[in-house]
Swiss-Prot record:
SMART domains assigned: PDGF
Source organism: Mus musculus
PTM statement from Swiss-Prot or TrEMBL: Undergoes a complex proteolytic maturation which generates a variety of processed secreted forms with increased activity toward VEGFR-3, but only the fully processed form could activate VEGFR-2. VEGF-C first form an antiparallel homodimer linked by disulfide bonds. Before secretion, a cleavage occurs between Arg-223 and Ser-224 producing a heterotetramer. The next extracellular step of the processing removes the N-terminal propeptide. Finally the mature VEGF-C is composed mostly of two VEGF homology domains (VHDs) bound by non-covalent interactions.
Protein family: Belongs to the PDGF/VEGF growth factor family.
Protein name: Vascular endothelial growth factor C
CDD domains per UniProt: PDGF (cd00135)
Self-association and partners: Homodimer; non-covalent and antiparallel. Interacts with FLT4/VEGFR3; the interaction is required for FLT4/VEGFR3 homodimarization and activation.
InterPro entries for this protein: CXCXC_repeat, Cystine-knot_cytokine, PD_growth_factor_CS, PDGF/VEGF_dom, PDGF/VEGF_growth_factor
Entry GO terms, CC: extracellular space; membrane
Length: 415
């Protein structure tokens, strides 16, 4: 049942790419021709578009299954389809998120049986180990007067079609099977002799270039090559504007090569296959669109919460600037009302009260032997009315009590 749904959607997507609606036909054809390099623009621009078209053509020629084909043309949309299919069902969207128009698929031009037949044929012809019959005498170059019964044996050898004319289906690992046969030599001097012969049995295959084949045949150290095409050596990188990273080509490709239905003048990145929007990506485990970069509510910090629509951290208290009160302003970074009052030098700011307060008071000044001056918020000492010029030996004049006191009472002057 899943295979039937899979092929049905493949039919719809392929038809959508090839058969535009009448109203959008000129734009679709223009975008398609642009992707293939059929442009009448300036020579430089034409060369760029031709290069981009060659990238897409090379990519399409290299796909080896319906899944890969849809992944190239509609990466996000196809990923969402497979994800929801694993969850038990698929609901095909009916609106184009970019234009608001209903998306029209020409599914009537293909039927499920045809797609199923194509998919089965595609799988049958892929490069893989296949069971074949080989002639024992020809395999080992037996003498003309010697033959074997049975004359042929069944083993697996690599065979199938590669997606490029420059590639060959070759074995990358080989095992050996022992088979017991009758060996007969004429003129018959004795009866058939049972013999055990080892035959090469291919266990994995790969489409390889002639250079790779040469390296494998002439390799000093025989070892199995990877059975699958190598993955990108470099990690996914950030691409320029209007370019997207492609895991098959291992480089950035022009996004317009993948949007056949869009208008020529519209180079927006919100394509039809961008099902999650500009700030989100598909989580294949949950089949949900989540914020890019792993942004979660816990990463927003105190006083903030994650807006799941815009994927931005916003203030959770929803305060407005006029709700902070006098001498306070709303700080969007901390999501709090902060004091912005400017105080005189002798009246520092008290952040908790957002008020200018004196650092000195009557009690503090009294302990210093001074009086508190309210206007200046400072302590001061009144001059002595009768200041003695000379004190008896062992005594010193104190400005605090305006009399002579023992010298050891006098506090040292502190710089």
């Amino acid at each position: 049942m899943h295979l039937l749904c899979f092929l049905s959607l493949a039919c719809s997507l392929l038809a959508a790419a090839l058969i535009p609606s009448p109203r959008e036909a000129p734009a679709t054809v223009a975008a398609f021709e642009s992707g293939l390099g059929f442009s009448e623009a300036e020579p430089d621009g034409g060369e760029v578009k031709a290069f981009e078209g060659k990238d897409l053509e090379e990519q399409l020629r290299s796909v080896s299954s319906v899944d890969e084909l849809m992944s190239v043309l509609y990466p996000d949309y196809w990923k969402m389809y497979k994800c929801q299919l694993r969850k038990g069902g698929w609901q095909q969207p009916t609106l184009n998120t970019r234009t608001g128009d209903s998306v029209k698929f020409a599914a009537a031009h293909y039927n499920t049986e045809i797609l199923k037949s194509i998919d089965n044929e595609w799988r049958k012809t892929q490069c893989m180990p296949r069971e074949v019959c080989i002639d024992v005498g020809k395999e080992f170059g037996a003498a003309t007067n010697t033959f074997f019964k049975p004359p042929c044996v069944s083993v697996y050898r690599c065979g199938g079609c590669c997606n490029s004319e420059g590639l060959q289906c070759m074995n990358t690992s080989t095992g050996y099977l022992s088979k017991t046969l009758f060996e007969i030599t004429v003129p018959l001097s004795q009866g058939p002799k049972p013999v055990t012969i080892s035959f090469a049995n291919h266990t994995s295959c790969r489409c390889m270039s002639k250079l790779d084949v040469y390296r494998q045949v002439h390799s000093i150290i025989r070892r199995s090559l990877p059975a699958t095409l190598p993955q990108c050596q470099a990690a996914n990188k950030t691409c320029p504007t209007n370019y997207v990273w492609n895991n098959y080509m291992c480089r950035c490709l022009a996004q317009q090569d993948f949007i056949f239905y869009s208008n020529v003048e519209d180079d927006s990145t919100n394509g039809f296959h961008d099902v999650c929007g500009p700030n989100k990506e598909l989580d294949e485990d949950t089949c949900q669109c989540v914020c890019k970069g792993g942004l979660r509510p816990s990463s927003c910090g105190p006083h903030k919460e994650l807006d799941r629509d815009s994927c931005q951290c916003v203030c959770k208290n929803k305060l407005f600037p006029n709700s902070c009160g006098a001498n306070r302003e709303f700080d969007e970074n901390t999501c709090q009302c902060v004091c912005k009052r400017t105080c005189p030098r002798n009246q520092p700011l008290n952040p908790g009260k957002c008020a200018c307060e004196c650092t000195e008071n009557t009690q503090k000044c009294f302990l210093k032997g001074k009086k508190f001056h309210h206007q200046t918020c400072s302590c001061y000492r009144r001059p002595c009315a009768n200041r003695l010029k000379h004190c008896d030996p062992g005594l010193s004049f104190s400005e605090e009590v305006c009399r002579c006191v023992p010298s050891y009472w006098k506090r040292p002057h502190l710089n």
